[in-house]
Amino acid sequence: MTGDRPTGKLHLGHYVGSLKRRVELQNSGEYDEIYIMIADAQALTDNADNPDKVRNNIIEVALDYLSCGLDPAKSNIFIQSQVPELTELAFYYMNLVTVSRLQRNPTVKSEIQMRNFEASIPVGFFTYPISQASDITAFKATTVPVGEDQKPMIEQTVEIVRRFNSVYGEVLVEPEVLLPQNAACLRLPGTDGKAKMSKSLGNCIYLSDSAEDVRKKVMGMFTDPNHLKVSDPGKVEGNCVFTYLNAFSKPEHFAKYLPEYASLDELKEHYRCGGLGDVKCKKLLIAVLEEELAPIRARRREFEQNIEGVYEMLRKGSQVAQAKAARTLMEVKDAMRINYFQDKELIARQAEAYRECK
């Protein structure tokens, strides 16, 4: 089980962080059920005054999912707000988490700083780790593929699962986090060298960007500020071009585009020694990214011709997700002893007790 907030089109950071892996897992045949959530309710926690932003980006995220290879026949794609059971589960889980524990969550802390929420944090945003725990546990997820920055969220979910099972009995499944295999994909920086891609910072390469947009963004990408001349020795560490090449390049790319280099390691060594310009490295990256993005772009154009069909896919996916979440919610309420109308023994016992009083 995994998902994304619909606050904009998905970018390369999403792609290498978890999206590409989702497609691989989907096609591996290892999982009986796969749930991919468009987290609109979570997106509203810091966009409450701009619901149209979330509303309009539902379709963008869905198109990105489909164009990357997520298949509704194998992966159940749904919209979070259309599964109300998730909200009810989160409400019960709130009793199992302290305010101080939420404050210590490093992901929450960094997100609060990034959004300048220091003095006025919306309650919904502050508690979104609990909401994520609800999303994961509702589907009895065993595996959650995410980027490195979301690892604390899964740890929080595990704590909630253990606490619930300890208090009420073994009902919830403890999930495991699945990080990207390539260390370079743990977190892809923005094109400006900032730690994270962000639409507001304008440092993203979107999956739906045209070839020309990708070319312009790569040519303007942050490199080594001290590498002023081709002859200057360059620094590979912290250099966005090489970070992206780490994530996307394959050995065959060098034979195809830069046959004078046997591998990325050779290219790096030449750059470190001097005599290799940034433009040559950037042109390689442009070619590598185009190989990855061209088929995604083409598939997106096809799905864009059937928006009605995409929404129908989301509607059906949400129905399947709701049925699954409803079963988990019933188990949770049974364990918590708040299943009053289903507990015939309780009703009969209390009725008998009052009859005896007469």
Region spans (language model):
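Internal, conserved structured core segments that host functional sites
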Residues: 106-110, 114-164, 168, 189-190
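Conserved nucleotide- and phosphate/pyrophosphate-binding catalytic cores
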Residues: 152, 158-358
